[in-house]
């Protein structure tokens, strides 16, 4: 659904709430080609590891423009946040239910917002707008498994997410 069609579609749904399926079908269009798909083989190869250090090593060793561009982008991001993201992806692939994932996501988010890198990211992008965050730890190697385990610690039952 193109963004330009939203006002018209909203008005049509408001006028005929029972016709949502037909309205959305009539307004839908094929998605444009995603340029990222042109790099699918590179992405699958370069990002195959479950560790950030190995992803960085693969990008550094590749020598291609795409790998160099991605490495440059990743080096501006919080090493802690990237390691948290990799762990969430890995753990999520093993979970049996959406509720289990939500429990973990909520606990992780609760811990992350209390840490330096979250506050530093807010400072660099929203407050000072200098886009020069000073991450701590500053490198993937400095983000220890112990630190990540602390971020993934379950919340006490009274604070944990529940589906109700």
Where are these regions (language model features)?
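Short alpha-helix boundary/capping motifs
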Residues: 17-21, 113, 153-154
């Amino acid at each position: 659904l193109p963004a330009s069609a939203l006002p018209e579609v909203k008005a049509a749904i408001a006028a005929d709430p029972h016709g949502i399926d037909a309205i959305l079908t009539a307004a839908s269009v094929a998605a444009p080609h995603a340029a990222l798909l042109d790099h699918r083989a590179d992405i699958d190869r370069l990002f195959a590891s479950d560790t950030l250090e190995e992803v960085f090593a693969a990008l550094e060793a590749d020598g291609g423009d795409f790998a160099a561009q991605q490495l440059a982008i990743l080096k501006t991001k919080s090493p802690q946040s990237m390691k948290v993201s990799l762990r969430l992806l890995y753990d999520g692939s093993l979970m049996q239910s959406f509720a289990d994932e939500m429990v973990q996501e909520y606990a992780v988010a609760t811990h992350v917002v209390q840490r330096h890198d979250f506050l530093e990211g807010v400072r660099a992008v929203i407050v000072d707008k200098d886009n020069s965050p000073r991450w701590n730890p500053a490198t993937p190697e400095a983000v220890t498994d112990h630190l990540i385990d602390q971020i993934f610690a379950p919340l006490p039952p009274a604070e944990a997410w529940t589906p109700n």
